[in-house]
Amino acid sequence: SYFGLVPAALLGVDVKTLLDRAVTAAGYCRSCTPPGPGVVTGAWLGAILGKLAKAGRDKATFVLSPAIASFGDWVEQLIAESTGKQGTGIFPVVGEPVGDPDVYGDDRLFIYLRLDGDDTYDGAVQALQDAGQPVVRLHLEDIYDLGEQFFLWEMTIAVAGYRLGINPFDQPNVEAAKILARAMVSEYQEKGRLPANEAAPLASEALARFLDQAETDDYITLQAYVQPTPETDRALLSLRTRLRDRLKLATSVGYGPRFLHSTGQSHKGDAGNGLFIQLTSDATQDIPIPDEAGTTSSSITFGVLKAAQALGDRRALEDAGRRVIHFDLEQNVVTGLQRLAEGLA
C-alpha cells in the first residue's frame, strides 16, 4: 500500500524492483507445488506450517540474516494476529538467540531466511537440523527479495489458517484489552486514580514460583511496558535467553503497548499455553494529552494511558484464563530486569 511504499521511496528504496519481486512470488504461488528447485509456494509452506502445528510443532522460530532481521517484526504480527484464535494458533518466535540443540523441545519449526553470502547462522542451523529439528530454508538473493517474502508469507499464513480450521482474516480478541483500557481511563477521569495493578515482589524467587506452573510446550512472553533503550534491549534479551535455556520453552519479548497490535490477539485467543510476565516502570517524563484538539486542558497523560493499557491487557488475559504475573521495575528498569534474571543462571 502507499502507507508503506511512499516512505520506502523517500528513503531511496527501489520500489519498482521490490514490487516486481512480489509479482514474481504471486506467479509462483499460482501453483500448489513448487515449480522448480529452490522455489517455495505459499500453498506448500502453509500446508507445512499448518500440518506441523496440528502435530504439536506450533512454535515457528525464525532465524534471520542480520541485514533482514527487522522482517521478523512484520511476520510476527502476521502470524500471531492471523492464527492465534479459537483455541489454536502458531506462535511466532523472532529475535530469540540461536541456541544449542539441547535447549529446544519438540514443539519447534525453524525457518531460516538466509541472505546470499551471509553464513552467520549456517553452522547453528545445520546443528539443529542434524539434531532432528525440522528446518525450512528460504534463500534471498538480495534485500529486494523481501518483496517476494511479503507476498509468500501472506499466502502461507492464509493457507495455514485454513489447515487449522480458523479464519485468518479476523481478530476477535484484539478489542478485549481496548475495552478494558478505556474503562480504566474513564475511572481515572472520574476518581483521579487507576485501579490497582498489584505487583509481585521484585525478586527472582517470585518469578521462579510463577514459572513452576510451566509445562512442556508452553511459551513465555515478556510484556515490557518500559522505555525502549539499547540497555533495556540487552537486559530483556539476557532474561529471555535464560528463561529459554532453563525451561526449554519458546520465548518472546514485546514492548507495550506496541505488542497489543502484533501478538496481543494470539495471547488471548490461542490454546492458553502462554505464561505472561508483565513489566512496568515509572514514567521518567510524562506528557499531558489534550482532551480536545487545539486545547490545552488535559485530564490524563501518556503515562496514565500506558498504565491503563497495561492494566487492561492484564485483566483481559486473566478473563481469558491466562497465567500472568506483574513486576513493577519502578525507575531502574535494567537493574530490575537483572534482579529477575539472577536466579535463572
Residue ranges of predicted features:
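General beta-strand structural signal in soluble alpha/beta enzymes
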Residues: 17-20, 137, 251-255, 326
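Active-site phosphate/pyrophosphate-binding segments
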Residues: 1-109, 116-119, 142-148, 152-250, ...
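A structural-propensity feature for long, helix-poor, extended segments
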Residues: 111-114, 289-318
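Ligand-binding clefts of soluble mixed alpha/beta catalytic domains
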Residues: 143, 158, 164-167, 281-296, ...
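Phosphate/diphosphate-binding loops
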Residues: 112-139
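Conserved, well-ordered active-site substructure
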Residues: 259-296
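C-terminal amphipathic alpha-helical interaction region
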Residues: 170, 175, 190, 209-222, ...
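Hydrophobic/aromatic beta-strand patches that form the interior of the parallel beta-sheet core
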Residues: 91-93, 109-113, 136-139, 275-277, ...
